[in-house]
Structure formats: structure tokens, C-alpha cells
């Protein structure tokens, strides 16, 4: 999670943190579809639903904590940016469970959906940006921030910053 201010030409990173949206105490929560694929279908549906509900609760808690931290520093939180994957529609659960590549796709989609849902629960508008729409120029524009804020300055943080600035521009 990256909180940003400013613009792409004058960006500022206010906060960055890893948030946990898969409960390590809940078996299978990190890869719920992989876990479900090993179960009879009736149990698989329940397993995926439990992981989803748990992840939603964790995401709301993480977003609320971030918002509170930013507000305590005098910042107004006006929205949430979310990086999207390929956007290909998923089939029904039985087809997902029968295809190993779809297990990965479904898990990525589930966690993005969880974050989007949680942001809306926290009354934050969500700006979704497909990864393929991120330009090399926009990523290059924020590359130098890494020196100012220190390591780590990973690709996922760079992507999150560009998407956060896009959400801010639309707020």
C-alpha cells in the first residue's frame, strides 16, 4: 500500500506499508483456490467463502488503520487506486478448480476484489487502472523517488504510487 500526494510531475510518497489480507491462522487463506481444488466441491465453496470473508475483514482493518495514520498526520484521504490484472473474465468455480492456471488468476482477482470492496466499505472511491495502461514514462517519472524515501523501492511500490496518483488526480 502506498499513499501519495502531488502529481506525476511532482510526486510525494506519504506512507508505504505491506498490508496483510490473508490470515495466516486460517488454513488455505493465502491460496484459497489452490486449497479448494483439493476438496470436494461442497467443501471447496465453503473454504473459498471463508477465505474471502476473512480477507475482507483484514482489508477493512488495514485500510482504516492507514487512513487513521494519514489523518493523524494532517492528510486528507480522498480515494483509493487499485492496479488491475489482465481483466479476463473468470468461469464458474468448478471450471476454476479444474484448471491450475485459473487457480492463480482467481486468487489474484479475489484479492483485488477484496481491496476494492474494503475501500468502498471505508467510503473511499476506487480508481481501477489496468496494469497494461501504466506507461514506461509514468513509471520513469517516479523512479527517482526511491532515492528520496530509501529502500525498498520495488516495482509493486512504483506501480502502486502511479495508481495512487491517478486516483488522486480523479478525486
Sequence positions of predicted segments:
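Phosphate- and other anionic-substrate recognition elements at nucleic-acid/protein interfaces
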Residues: 2-171
